[in-house]
């Protein structure tokens, strides 16, 4: 009940605040997108994208959208200016999260409602009303405030790559990869935890199998994962390998500092110079792998993966 009231109040306040964005909108600011092109973290849900996002926001000098600003999807530039001006929140970014949501108002956000202003639920960009130009102006306004490249993490962007690259011509994509069976188990556990229903869709819809009630949950989950990475592969073939940086979740956990430095080096090769902050990078993180579901579910998911690999 309290959450619904909060949402209703924020929705009303966003409508009121939206006209203020025009005060800061300047087409000349689009030049900042060439100076500081955005970087997008993509991959399957439950692949480790959130912890990579937190690590990069904490240890490299990226700009990012925090949880406070995320509450203002229709007035993000105004909200960022207010936050920069008045916030005394100095909570450090921690590496805790719950299904993509980080802690504190200062924590990195997926910024989901903002992106749905510009994209359909089918992942198609809303091309009407000169939206490409409007979105570029809005993101460039945020970039101007931060004076550094913005990094965004939202797994739905895995299905929007070509549109994002068309809008942000110099943008780059960091792809998280993890063992498929580990991802599948984590998605299944998320379905059970959030909905108490193994068949309830979770996170990005990348395949119609996810929405077909006649299809088994193990097939729907594996189809979801496969469709996401197939779309990333297609985008890589279309745009070129140099637009993508691939990161192994296992390597990230077992050699955290080394992988962050590798990412920094790869960005530098692509003309993105992102210095490290002075805080200490952890040597490694807990690597979660192995069986996390019942024997029956584990067998079903494993067999479904093998079935796909045989077809492939």
Where are these regions (language model features)?
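A conserved segment at the C-terminal end of the G1
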Residues: 50-63
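Pre-Walker A (Motif I) flank of P-loop NTPase domains
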Residues: 36-38
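The Walker A (P-loop) glycine that initiates the GxxxxGKT/S ATP-binding motif of P-loop NTPases
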Residues: 42-43, 153
């Amino acid at each position: 009940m309290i959450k619904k009231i909060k949402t209703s109040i924020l929705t009303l306040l966003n409508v009121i605040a939206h006209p203020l964005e025009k005060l800061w909108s300047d087409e000349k600011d689009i030049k900042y997108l060439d100076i500081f092109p955005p970087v997008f973290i993509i991959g399957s849900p439950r692949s480790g994208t959130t912890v990579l996002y937190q690590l990069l926001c904490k240890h490299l000098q990226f700009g990012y959208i925090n949880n406070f600003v995320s509450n203002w999807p229709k007035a993000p530039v105004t909200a960022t200016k207010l936050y920069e001006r008045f916030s005394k929140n100095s909570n450090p970014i921690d590496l805790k999260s719950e299904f993509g949501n980080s802690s504190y108002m200062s924590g990195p956000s997926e910024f989901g409602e903002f992106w749905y202003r510009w994209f359909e639920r089918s992942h198609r960009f809303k091309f009407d009303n000169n939206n490409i130009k409007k979105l570029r102006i809005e993101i460039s306004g945020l970039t101007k405030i931060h004076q550094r490249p913005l990094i965004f993490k939202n797994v739905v962007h895995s299905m929007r790559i070509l549109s994002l690259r068309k809008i942000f011509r110099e943008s780059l994509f960091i792809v998280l990869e993890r063992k498929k069976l580990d991802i599948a188990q984590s998605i299944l556990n998320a379905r059970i935890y959030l909905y108490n229903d193994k068949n309830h869709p979770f996170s990005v819809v990348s395949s119609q199998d996810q929405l077909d009630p006649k299809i088994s949950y193990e097939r729907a989950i594996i189809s979801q994962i496969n469709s996401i990475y197939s779309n990333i592969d297609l985008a890589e073939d279309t745009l070129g390998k140099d637009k993508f940086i691939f990161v192994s979740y296992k390597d990230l956990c077992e050699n955290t500092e080394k992988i962050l430095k590798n990412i920094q080096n790869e960005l530098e090769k692509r003309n993105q110079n992102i210095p490290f902050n002075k805080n200490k990078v952890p040597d490694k993180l807990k690597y979660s792998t192995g069986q996390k579901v019942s024997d029956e579910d584990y067998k079903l998911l494993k067999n479904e993966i093998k079935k796909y690999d045989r077809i492939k």
